[in-house]
Swiss-Prot record:
Belongs to the PduL family. GO terms for biological process: propanediol catabolic process. Zn(2+) 2 binds at H139, H141, H186. Its cofactor is Zn(2+). Keywords: Acyltransferase, Bacterial microcompartment, Metal-binding, Transferase, Zinc. Zn(2+) 1 binds at H30, H32, E91. CoA binds at A26, S27, G28, K72, N193. This is Phosphate propanoyltransferase. Phosphate binds at R85. Formed by 2 beta-barrels, each is capped on both ends by short alpha-helices.
Amino acid sequence: MENLLNEIVEEVITRVKKEAFIEVEASGRHVHLSREDVDKLFGEGYTLTKLKDLSQPGQYACKERVTITGPKGSIKNVVVLGPCRNETQVEISLTDGSTLGLKAPIKQSGDLEGTLSIKISTQYGEVELDKGLMVAKRHIHMTPKDAEKFNVCDKEIVEAKVMGQRPLTFDDVVIRVSDSFKTYMHIDYDEANACGYSKGTVAKIIKKA
């Protein structure tokens, strides 16, 4: 009887979390490559090797790794995400920027205006980007249905209280709504460390007045 009650309580808690909270994911440094740059880094016509699917539909981590280099230093074994994009983009944390000797701007993914140059290399080749290095702005991917439920809209800026081991309210969180998304909040590892993130951490949206 006690086990049954515990199962019921756990199910109720899970349902409440899904209704009121959003699951948080921490994203490490990574690279999105254009078709042209895949050819330069791995060879003409090379196909990236899918390693595992990510939470967002159609997105996946690849087996391939690259090195990124700035004026002060390099970071090896940076994961490549697929599929290919129109333009190459490198997403790092502010701490990574210190290692590289670069103060990368905080930008939304895909907005390359004002981003920095960076070198990407493998044992087969290298690419010198004129732009593309950024720190990703913290954001929430959201389905239209969930956007309606949480009463938010695409590109809206909200606060989000992350219930990690050290609960923390983040300001300047951008909502991104699309039929192609699953609902997750994305932060980088600097932010994850600040709030004591662990797998299963959730966040609550706080609407701005």
